[in-house]
C-alpha cells in the first residue's frame, strides 16, 4: 500500500475520532470520515495485548489487503481500523469476512 493511502499524523487520527462516525462488530471497530480526495486513507491500530510484533504486523497486512481489494467502493473516506481481541486467531478468510461485515454495517460497501 502506498504511503498516500495511510493516515499517519496524530492530528488526522484525532480528526477522524472526533468528527467521524464509528461502527463495530466483535472483531473490529471502524471510525470513518468522508473526505474530498481521490482515494481512501487508512490508519490501523492493533494493541500489544493481541501478540508480539510479528503477530500484530501480520494482522495489519491482512487488514490492508482486504481494504485494497475493496478499493473502488471505499473512495473518498479516511478510516481508522481498530482490531479487537480474537483477531489474532482468525485466518485470512475469516478476517476478511468480519471486516467486510463491519463495512457493510456502516453502509460503505
Curated annotation (Swiss-Prot):
One of its GO terms (molecular function) is tRNA binding. Keywords: Endonuclease, Hydrolase, Nuclease, RNA-binding, tRNA processing. It catalyses: Endonucleolytic cleavage of RNA, removing 5'-extranucleotides from tRNA precursor. It is an enzyme of class 3 (hydrolase). The gene is rnpA. It comes from the Bacteria. InterPro entries: Ribosomal_Su5_D2-typ_SF, Ribsml_uS5_D2-typ_fold_subgr, RNase_P, RNase_P_CS. Coiled coil: none annotated. The keyword Chaperone does not apply. The lineage of its organism: Bacteria, Bacillati, Bacillota, Bacilli, Lactobacillales. Belongs to the RnpA family. This is Ribonuclease P protein component. Its EC number is 3.1.26.5.
